[in-house]
C-alpha cells in the first residue's frame, strides 16, 4: 500500500489535529520547518477547479517524527479533532494505548467544548462523553503521560469570535 501513495494521498485521508510546542530555540526552528512544509510541499487543495481554490496546510506524521527525535519539540494530542479523542470514541483500549504512545502529553478540554457532539448526535449523551474522557484519563495515567487541561481557544476577546466564524465559514465558499 505504501508504494501506491503519491503526492495527492493527503487529499484522500481525514486530517487530525495535533499540538506542537517548541521547548527551545532549536525547537522553534524545527517548528518553523514543519509550518513551511505544511504550506508548501503538503498543502492540500480540496478543489479540482482553479476557481475558488481552498487550501489547507497539513503535515505528515513522519515529518513530525523526524524533527521530534532531537528532543526540542513536545507533541500534544490536541482537541476533539485529534486522533486520541477519535480513537477513544470509536476503537478499542489497546488501539487507544497504541495511539497515545506517540504523544508527549494528552490534552482535555472542558465538557462544554464537546457539547456540539451531543447536539449532532455523534455522542449519545453527557454520560457517554464522560466515559470517553475517563477512558482517556485512565489510559494517560497508565502510560505516565501528563494530562493538560486546555481550552482549545481560538481567540482572546469575545468580539473576535465573529472574525473566526467568518474565516472558518469562508473556507467553504
Each model region followed by its residue ranges:
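Phosphodiester-processing cores and adjacent nucleic acid-binding clamps
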Residues: 1-173
Amino acid at each position: 500500500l505504501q508504494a501506491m501513495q503519491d503526492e495527492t494521498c493527503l487529499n484522500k485521508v481525514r486530517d487530525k489535529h495535533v499540538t506542537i510546542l517548541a521547548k527551545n530555540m532549536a525547537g522553534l526552528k524545527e517548528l518553523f520547518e514543519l509550518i513551511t512544509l505544511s504550506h508548501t510541499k503538503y498543502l492540500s487543495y480540496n478543489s479540482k477547479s482553479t476557481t475558488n481554490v481552498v487550501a489547507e496546510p497539513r503535515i505528515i506524521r513522519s515529518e513530525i517524527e523526524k524533527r521530534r527525535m532531537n528532543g526540542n519539540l513536545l507533541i500534544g494530542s490536541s482537541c476533539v479533532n485529534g486522533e486520541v479523542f477519535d480513537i477513544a470514541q470509536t476503537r478499542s483500549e489497546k488501539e487507544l494505548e497504541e495511539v497515545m504512545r506517540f504523544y508527549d502529553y494528552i490534552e482535555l478540554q472542558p465538557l462544554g467544548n464537546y457539547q456540539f457532539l451531543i447536539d449532532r448526535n455523534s455522542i449519545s449523551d453527557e454520560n457517554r462523553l464522560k466515559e470517553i474522557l475517563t477512558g482517556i484519563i485512565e489510559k494517560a495515567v497508565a502510560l505516565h503521560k501528563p494530562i493538560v487541561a486546555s481550552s482549545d481557544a481560538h481567540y482572546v476577546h469575545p468580539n473576535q469570535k465573529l472574525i473566526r466564524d467568518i474565516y472558518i465559514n469562508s473556507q467553504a465558499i
